[in-house]
């Protein structure tokens, strides 16, 4: 019984030493034996879009709707075209860049909240 346990332990030690020789399927010494058929390493990072195209379009439509509402609040009328809405910059709380003051009303709630002007 102990021999089989010792035998399993020795097999685990052997497999543990073999695993230390490779990292993520690529040899430690950097030889090109593990390269795929396309010539790139199999453990190379590949770009995967975290946001699908439909999700990106939905986000853009939501942003455009927010800009349209901000345009209507600022000028008191509906925009003439989508081009005017896209060109009108709306206030972004997360944007830390310096923003032009002439696009915003000075009594706007964002400025009171964050202490601008």
Curated annotation (Swiss-Prot):
Q: Which UniProt keywords apply?
A: Autocatalytic cleavage, Host cytoplasm, Hydrolase, Protease, Viral capsid assembly, Viral release from host cell
Localization per record: Host cytoplasm
**UniProt-annotated stretches for the region Disordered:** 1-60
GO biological process: one example? viral capsid assembly
Under Enzyme Commission nomenclature, its number is: 3.4.-.-
Q: What is its main location?
A: host cell
What does the UniProt PTM comment say about this protein? The proteolytic cleavage of the internal scaffolding protein B releases the scaffold protein in order to continue virion assembly.
| Gene Ontology cellular-component terms listed | host cell cytoplasm
GO molecular function (one)? peptidase activity
Q: Where is the composition biased (Polar residues)?
A: 1-52
Q: What InterPro entries does the record point to? A: Phage_B (IPR003513), Phage_B_sf (IPR038149)
**According to UniProt, where does the site described as Cleavage lie?**
74-75, 90-91, 105-106
At the top level of its lineage, which domain of life is listed?
Viruses
Q: How does it assemble?
A: Component of the procapsid complex composed of 60 copies of the internally located B, 240 copies of the external scaffolding protein D, 60 copies of each of the viral structural proteins F and G proteins, and 12 copies of H.
- Main function: Participates in the assembly of the viral procapsid in the cytoplasm. Forms first a 12S pre-assembly complex with protein H, and F and G pentamers, then twelve 12S complexes are joined by the D protein to form the procapsid. Internal scaffold protein B is released from the procapsid upon genome packaging. Autoproteolytic activity cleaves protein B and probably facilitates its removal through the pores of the procapsid.
Q: Which family does it belong to?
A: Belongs to the microviridae B protein family.
Recorded protein name is Internal scaffolding protein B
Organism for this UniProt entry = Escherichia phage alpha3 (Bacteriophage alpha-3)
